[in-house]
Amino acid sequence: PVRVELHLTTEQQAATRAMDENCIRDVNLYLYGDTEYHFYFPSVSSPLVFNVLPGNYRSYAIANAGQDLGDKNAFKIQFYETAVDVMESSDAIPMTDRGTLAVDGAGRCTPSSLRVTRSAAKIAYTIEVADAVAPSLRLRSVQFCNLPRTIRPFDSGSISSTVEANYYDGEAMPVGNERRTAGTAYLFENLQG
């Protein structure tokens, strides 16, 4: 085996006060080639350092899972699910990357970094009652409904579940101003259509 140093980067977007969109607390790294590897980094410093045999690998990185996900073969990783509970309890957005890595005999890795992307969409909203209807319409609360409980970040193109139990309604958030409210939420993709 050779020693490899692999850098991990995130989408460079401004962080909000509610959640640090670029925070990486832990990483599970899976490599599939002639030999399969799983590495868990419970705290992340750059670069990630590990030992593998030289070769070509399909790589899967899962950031902010909050735990060592254990070994998963190349088939099972396609169906890995992350739950909204993980994101809400850790205050960190799940992030993933899928790609290929080539490791030479000197431990040089191409590409030399993985770029993880958020598995949840940032929704910035503003809701305002028009003057024409203000006498008869007041804002009381905002609630997101029909939210997926889980997503499969590596199962691209799959249609969201049609099972009602796989969805939930978010908490109704009281509004202090009856005419206008704004906020930010992080939601998993819903491909129900």
Stretch-by-stretch model annotation:
Residues V49-N51, T100-A102, S113-R115, Q143:
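Generic structural detector for well-ordered beta-strands
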